[in-house]
Amino acid sequence: MMDKIIQTLTLTFTFLYYSIPMLIVGLFISQILIESNIIKKIYFIGKIFTRLANLPEECGIAITTSFIEPRMANIMLVDFYKKGIINKKELYISSLIDAFPAMLRHWDSLLPILLATLGFFGIIYFIILVLIGFIQTLIFMAIGKITLKNREYKEDNTDKKIKLNKDVVYTAFKNTIKYGIPIIRDITIASIITSFLIEFGFFDYITEIIKNKAYYLPLSVEEITVAVTQPINYIGAFVLAGEFLNRGILDEIEVVRALLLGSILSSIPALRFLAPYYIGIYGFKDGFNLMMISTLVRILITALFVIITLIL
């Protein structure tokens, strides 16, 4: 039992060591972007999303930021919510709309691996992943359009001149401390709970159940092999899929189907890392709700794509 506790604390410390510094840096940079008016210079990107979803213009600032750094965007939304600028429903919809820019932002980390393992077909698969994120964004934009009141958008005539001085840095630093302390507190507690569940095999148990069910699907052994490898080692799954594709064992549609199924299976172990992130930024209740809504909707959309490949 003592070994489990030590392992839990070690795992927690490791996660916090790698996540908190970047989170604080992201928070500080987001405050600099806001206070210096830099974000207003590229606000036109987010304006498209806010006007189609009946969201306040402030949400457009966060959505614009999500194309640069999704973590900063989420911190901005929480900041707006705590200041009373946006309400709870607008917070949820704005956060869930971030699916497309967040997925697109992975191009620099995911696309090179896909190109190296799957060649040109890796680009096709990445486009499919981006399309899934885009559909998720469209769904929540539609929900915003239906559930939020229509609003009039006035032309923003405020001063958009970029200002970088000591006052901007001081205000950004002060806000970073103000909002950073509760985030660090929540992310630490969430990390301890998540690490405890990891050490006692909760996520492995759930993943194993789902993997066993996957064998009942009408797929080839090779497709299942790629899919069940992905939660364990996604690079290994890409390499395996590339080998099967090059040897003609699987065709392009079968590889897509296998990798999409693998991404569904990967959703459960991914919660180990998503839980501290969401809960740390949004708090326990809202963080858990947003994490589960986003995960479930993405799984449903991905499952729909898998079904389409079975029909083709």
Swiss-Prot record:
Ranges annotated as spanning the membrane: 9-29, 115-135, 187-207, 224-244, 264-284, 292-312
Primary localization: membrane
Compartment list: Cell membrane
Organism, as annotated: Methanocaldococcus jannaschii (strain ATCC 43067 / DSM 2661 / JAL-1 / JCM 10045 / NBRC 100440)
Upper lineage: Archaea, Methanobacteriati, Methanobacteriota, Methanomada group, Methanococci
Keyword Protein biosynthesis: no
Membrane topology classification: Multi-pass membrane protein
GO cellular component: plasma membrane
Keyword presence, Repressor: no
Protein name per Swiss-Prot or TrEMBL: Uncharacterized protein MJ1556
